[in-house]
Amino acid sequence: MGTWAQFGLQDASSPLMEELTYFHDYALIVLTLITILVFYGLVSLLVSSNTNRFFFEGQELETIWTVIPALILILIALPSLQLLYLMDEVNDPFLTIKAFGHQWYWSYEYTDFNDLEFDSYMVPTSDVSFGNPRLLEVDNRLVLPMQNPIRVLVSSADVLHSWAVPSLGTKMDAVPGRLNQTTFFAARTGVFYGQCSEICGANHSFMPIVIESVPFNTFENWVTQYLEE
C-alpha cells in the first residue's frame, strides 16, 4: 500500500510487479546516462570558443549519433516486449473473476462457483475501524488464494473505469460493452489496495479495490461459509 511521502514504487507482491520494478530501474539508469551526456554536450558547446564556418558535414559523427541511439532504443525495447508478453499471456488460470465497475463501486463474480457474487463499496470515514486505511477499506473484500494464477474479466455497467492494484502490477480499463482481461499471481498472503484509475465522475476517488490474498485452505473455508450464508 502506498504511504505518505513515498517516492518509490510499492513493494512488489507478484512476479510481474518485480519484473516491472527491475525494468523501471534499468530504464531509469539508461535515461540518466543519456541526460548526463546531452547536458555535457550542451555545456561543452556553450563554453567552447572554437568555430568553423566551413564545416558543413561529418559523416562519421552523423553515423555515431544515428547508430548509438538506435542501439539504446533496442536495449530498452527488448525487455519491455518481454514484459508485454508476460502481461498479456493467460496460461490455464486457477480462478476467473468478473469485475464490473459502477458509479461508484465495484461488483465481483466468482465464475467458478454458483451464486458467489457481491458488491464492494468503500467504507465511510466515520465507520472505518482502527488500523484500517481511510478511503481505501471496503465492506466486501475480494478474497483470493495465494500463489495461483488469477484471471480477471473487467467491464463496466455505465462509464469508463479502470481496475488497478499497483502492488500486483495489474491495471485494466473497464469499458462499457467490452470484456477485457488481465491476470496476476499473488506471491504471498496479505491485503493489497488499489483504486479506480480512470476519472469516472464525482465520486471517482471513492471506489477502492481491496484484495485479500489467503492460503488455499482459508479460501476454501471462506467460499464454503459464504455459500452457506
UniProtKB/Swiss-Prot annotation:
Keyword Transcription regulation among UniProt keywords: no
Catalytic activity, EC: 7.1.1.9
Mitochondrial matrix side: 48-62
Positions annotated to bind Mg(2+): 198
Record-linked InterPro entries: CcO_II (IPR045187), CcO_II-like_C (IPR002429), CcO_II_C (IPR034210), Copper_CuA (IPR001505), Cupredoxin (IPR008972), Cyt_c_oxidase_su2 (IPR014222), Cyt_c_oxidase_su2_TM_dom (IPR011759), Cyt_c_oxidase_su2_TM_sf (IPR036257)
Free-text remark on how the cofactor is bound: Binds a dinuclear copper A center per subunit.
Stated family: Belongs to the cytochrome c oxidase subunit 2 family.
Protein name per UniProt: Cytochrome c oxidase subunit 2
Species in which this protein is naturally found: Strongylocentrotus purpuratus (Purple sea urchin)
Gene name in the database record: COII
